[in-house]
Amino acid sequence: MEKLAVIELGASEITFSKLKFTSNGFFMIEQQIKEPVRLTQDLERDGYIKSARIEETISLLKIFRKMMDSEGISMHVCYADPVLSTARNQLAFLDEIYKTVSLHFRILTFDEQVDALHLACLHSFPNIKGLICQINDDSMQIIQYNRRTVLNRCNISFGAYNLAEKFENVTDVSQKMDKMVDFITAQLRQEKWLFELEEDVECIGVGKFFEATGSLCRKSTHYPIDIAHNYEITDANFKSIYGLIKTLDIDKAKKLKGISNLPANVVASGIAIIKALFNNISKAHIKLSTCGEMYGLVARTILSQAEKPMLDILGYSLSAVNEFYPSGQDMNNIYDLSIILYKQLKILHRLNRNYVKILRISASMCLSGKRISFNNYEKNGFNVILGSNIYGATHHEILMAAFVVANQNSDNFSLSEWVRYKDILGEEDASAVKKLGLIVKLATLLNVTGSNAVKDIACDILGDTVILKTAVEKDASLEISQAQTIYSDFKKIFGKNLQIL
């Protein structure tokens, strides 16, 4: 396992990320530090990055360099926001950085920015057609794609920071918000293709301003799980947030407590941009992505087949989780046994194919709770799944999988706990969780020694008895003995006796 450092010089902050990655292309962020440095402040006045900002940047980079050296991290990716390309002293600035800390930064081109965002979405969303909207500090990018092909793209030279600065003299908050929306709308209307989108194009919001807005939406609706990626910001929910922001005292010295460390006036301008998007792209919701430029650049650096769209996004993210937090068992074998049982018991559980993805997540992470404690690891697994980066699945599927893992132990099912998630889960889901929980538990018991002794299972139903016949390649007496411990749970859930041979 190797380590990689990624440093981004943004328009308003410098981000240092430390990642772990493996030779087979899995990576995860181990540490991330963000420090506010407004590099582009007053840049439009004379075209120069100010010396005080340069000194502040280099002082910070010296610290990051020491951190890298202390851990022996030699591999790094260093890049700067394209907006810095407008600075007259950009080359002198980057040259001074290299001479001082031996870090070679390059300013991303718009093409590289588009490529990174496109690749990040291909690796974290299963959508065939998408519209990526990224809001930065001093710019925004909009990209339309169909699979691996970018169809249209545009760069708008206003982001949340410089939009807030443009209208800082407007004192009435409601009037200011409406003026910002009108201004961004005028920019969007210069791109005719934005108004010719097909209905099945999914809108994906990227960046800290979408994340802050998503956090506001989740808090306002008391959304029961705190997962940002793939969260849907609905038009209806967003309208209430926009209306609320217009009534607040928005000041650049203030912050929205519990929402973001960003200045409140900048969050408000970001929300104004999103309002303009909702007004013009005619979409009922925008899906939030936590995988932006950095994710795409790292994927391009590490993954040998980054040119190709990832065909199995969910499989990749589950494999990555198990790669960095191994359980000591072959999780693929447990999943294979779960699928066999799911098919063989179909006449009993009567669940459709929509539950297969839930089964895949829960079977792949059924032992994940042991990272916290072996005692009631099934219940611990609930929180582990909700805290893991799982891509290619909806919040409903992830939450269902968490409940399935917890309900490997049937005593863990609590109706009062279940009711907390009623806005995401349906009435029929409780029964499905109990059935899938038993299937996953049975699969883990049939692989209890980790020797992959059980290769196949056939099912016969004779009256009130279900007979599971195992096909084995070695001694599986312990596996069968352990599997017999769930006979009473099987009877309770499926209403039939179970025999395992």
Predicted feature locations:
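Helical "lid/coupling" subdomains associated with nucleotide-phosphate turnover
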Residues: 4, 18, 42-66, 86-87, ...
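Short secondary-structure junctions
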Residues: 448-454, 493-496
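Short, surface-exposed alpha-helical segments at coil->helix boundaries
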Residues: 87-94, 484
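Hydrophobic residues embedded in beta-strands of well-ordered beta-sheets
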Residues: 14, 26-27, 140, 150, ...
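A structural preference for short, hydrophobic beta-strand core positions in alpha/beta folds
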Residues: 78, 107, 288, 500-501
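N-terminal glycine/serine-rich phosphate-binding loop of ATP-dependent small-molecule kinases
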Residues: 1-5, 9-15, 19-80, 91-105
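Short, non-transmembrane amphipathic alpha-helical segments
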Residues: 476-497
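Ser/Thr-glycine-rich phosphate-binding loops at phosphate-binding pockets of nucleotides
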Residues: 11-13, 121, 135-142, 208
